[in-house]
Each structure stands twice: as C-alpha cells, then as structure tokens.
C-alpha cells in the first residue's frame, strides 16, 4: 500500500486534500477542500484528527478564508479574517494546536498590514505551507529525542493515534517507532483499541502494520494484564494540550493507562510538539474538555449496544496528572520533573 498521509497540499490547484479517517481501515479515500467552511466540517466531524494535523488543517482553512476576504482595505480584511479564525477555532476546543496555528496566521497578516491585501493573501498561503512543513520537521525531531530513551527489544504500549495519521508525517508517539524500524531494531508495539472511536485499532494499528512494524491490538481493558506480564517497557502517547504544570490532556483513557504504568513501574512518556504546550493554562483543571455525542457509544456501528434513551457521558479527553508522567519529549529536548520549572526553561532556550 502507498504511504498513508493525513494531509496533502496540491500547490497547482490550491486545494487541501485530507484522508477520510472516519472510514479507515475499510476504505482509503481522500477528500478535497478549498473553503473555510469545508475545513471546519473536516475538523468537527473528525475527517482529520490529532492535534498537530488539526493545526495544519486549520492554517489552510484560514488561508481559504483569506482568499475570499474583502480587499478594499486591511481593516475590513482583518476583521473578516478574525471572524473566520474564531469560527475555525470553535470546531474542536481541546486541541491547543488549533488555536496556535490560527494565531500564527493572524500574526503573519498583522506583520504585513502595510502591504497590499492581495499580497497578504499570498503571504498567508506560504505561511500555511510553512506550518505544514514545520510539523514534519518537529515530528522527526521528537522521534530522535524519544529513541534515546528506548533500546532494541523494547515493548511499547500506545493509546489512541499520535501517529503519522495525526500529524503531517512520522507522528509524535510513533516517530521513534519508525526510526527504530529504520535502525533494524527488534521491538513490539501494543496498540490500545481506544474506545469509543477506536483510533488505536483503526488508525495506529493500520499505519504501523502497513509500515511493517510488529504491532498487536488490545482492548483498553487488557492493558493491565499486558503490563503485569512484563510485555511493556515504556508507554508512549501523544497529547492535545499540556498545562504549565505538566498536566496533559489526551484521548479519553490515557489517564487510566498512566495510573497502571505508575503502579507497574513503567515509564510514561508524552510526545509533545511545543505548540501543544500551553503555558497560559496553569493546570489540567483549566483545560476545556470536549464532550461528544452519545451515538459514538450507543450505536457506533449502526447497531445499538445500549438501551435507547439511556443517559450517556462521553468526554473525548481526560487529563493525566503530571505526577504520573516520567518525561515530556519535545522537538527541543526532553523535559523531566519538576515540569512547572522545566517547561518554563524549555521556552527560554
């Protein structure tokens, strides 16, 4: 199978091309976008998912908004741009990369406010492409830092999908796996199924399997058993937002994995692009948690698995306490506790 990429940019046709992740692994189909409204829907409906990929997609979405924005003067242009930025930002509230990418695009427009509006539109196009390319570089650097914490023969547990399908390429949590494969290491990956949307089995297992990596899918409630059997040497997960104290929001179920890892003495590593670290959010209690629709739990595959009308609680994320985290691994380096002090130092470099 050809390499699976979540995001492609058609430079000649000025179109964003996204892999429809809602139908994986059964079908591989790409959808083209050229409007901010289409991009909003792609993020909201999880055609594209994963914090880094969402950020890149949103940047292109704001460029599409800029294309049709008023050109009579900068004030009207920027007012329209800000409105569309807020609109795109509302598509998924937990992933901080979304608002980060939109702010970068807004800042680029402001930096060039004295230029002709048509020229600013072209500048925003190039800025979205730069954010896309930068994400690839960041993911590879995270992998290079993470692999120093691993060794040949390692057993890894991962949760949800912080892989190539959640980023522009390589992934964050999976980046060291691809690099270890290149080195010829003999290692095993256990991929939590990740209820209720099954990103671990439909996405992570798919991309690792296609890459020839030894991957085994387990249900979420098997993680404790696998750890108790000595099969796991490290847990590596991604993140949607990290607070200034190290508390980490990631896909629902990650907190439980961290508790198990701590009990069994297994290191818990967070693979984190620096845009996912929100120093303006003090603790995990300040992170907004998206609640998703009940059908994801009661009738995910068109078959009812619960009584119709039953109450459903479906948070998309939980927050792993910083006390359960061994290290936060970024493209700039590895951050160890105390996170409150050391995350500050990371941004002072």
From Swiss-Prot:
Catalytic-site annotation from UniProt: 240
Pathway the protein acts in: Carbohydrate degradation
Assigned EC number: 5.3.1.-
The reaction(s) this protein catalyses: 5-deoxy-alpha-D-ribose 1-phosphate = 5-deoxy-D-ribulose 1-phosphate
Biological processes per GO annotation: L-methionine salvage from methylthioadenosine; pentose catabolic process
Signal peptide annotation: none
Entry's family note: Belongs to the EIF-2B alpha/beta/delta subunits family. DrdI subfamily.
PANTHER family: METHYLTHIORIBOSE-1-PHOSPHATE ISOMERASE (PTHR43475:SF1)
Record-linked NCBIfam families: eIF-2B_rel, PRK05720.1, salvage_mtnA
Key word Cell division present: no
UniProt GO MF annotations: S-methyl-5-thioribose-1-phosphate isomerase activity
Organism of derivation: Clostridium botulinum (strain Kyoto / Type A2)
Alphabetized HAMAP family for the sequence: Deoxyribose1P_isomerase, Salvage_MtnA
Summary of the function given for this chain in its UniProt record: Catalyzes the isomerization of 5-deoxy-alpha-D-ribose 1-phosphate to 5-deoxy-D-ribulose 1-phosphate, as part of a 5-deoxyribose salvage pathway that recycles this toxic radical SAM enzyme by-product to mainstream metabolites.
InterPro entries on file: Deoxyribose1P_isomerase_DrdI, IF-2B-related, IF-M1Pi, IF_2B-like_C, Initiation_fac_2B_a/b/d, M1Pi_N, NagB/RpiA_transferase-like
Protein name, as recorded: 5-deoxyribose 1-phosphate isomerase
Binding site for substrate: 49-51, 92, 199, 250-251
């Amino acid at each position: 199978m050809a390499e699976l990429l979540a995001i492609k940019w058609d430079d000649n046709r000025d179109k964003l091309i996204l892999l429809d992740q809602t139908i994986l692994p059964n079908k591989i189909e790409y959808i083209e976008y050229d409007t901010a409204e289409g991009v909003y829907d792609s993020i909201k409906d999880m055609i594209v998912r994963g914090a880094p990929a969402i950020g890149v997609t949103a940047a292109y979405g704001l460029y599409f908004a800029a294309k049709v924005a008023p050109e009579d003067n900068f004030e009207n242009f920027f007012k329209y741009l800000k409105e569309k930025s807020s609109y795109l930002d509302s598509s998924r509230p937990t992933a901080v990369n979304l608002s980060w990418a939109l702010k970068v695009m807004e800042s680029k427009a402001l930096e060039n406010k004295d230029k002709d509006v048509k020229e600013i539109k072209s500048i925003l196009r190039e800025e979205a492409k730069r954010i896309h390319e930068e994400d690839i570089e960041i993911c590879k650097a995270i992998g290079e830092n993470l692999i120093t914490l691993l060794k040949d023969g390692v057993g890894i547990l991962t949760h949800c999908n912080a892989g190539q399908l959640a980023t522009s390429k390589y992934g964050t949590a999976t980046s060291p796996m691809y690099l270890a494969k290149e080195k010829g290491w003999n290692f095993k990956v256990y991929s939590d199924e990740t209820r209720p949307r099954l990103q671990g089995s439909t996405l992570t297992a798919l991309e690792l399997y296609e890459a020839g990596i030894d991957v085994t899918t387990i249900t979420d409630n098997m993680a404790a058993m696998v750890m108790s059997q000595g099969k796991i040497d490290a847990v590596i997960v991604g993140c949607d937002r990290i607070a200034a104290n190290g508390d980490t929001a990631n896909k629902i179920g990650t907190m439980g994995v961290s508790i198990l890892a701590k009990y069994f003495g297994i290191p818990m590593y967070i693979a984190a692009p620096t845009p996912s670290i929100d120093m303006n959010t003090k603790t995990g209690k300040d992170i907004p948690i998206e609640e998703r629709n009940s059908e994801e739990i009661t009738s995910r595959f068109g078959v009812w698995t619960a009584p119709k009308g039953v109450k459903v609680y479906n948070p998309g994320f939980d927050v792993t306490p910083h006390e359960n985290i061994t290290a936060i691994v970024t493209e700039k380096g590895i951050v160890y506790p105390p996170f409150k002090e050391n995350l500050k130092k990371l941004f002072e470099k």
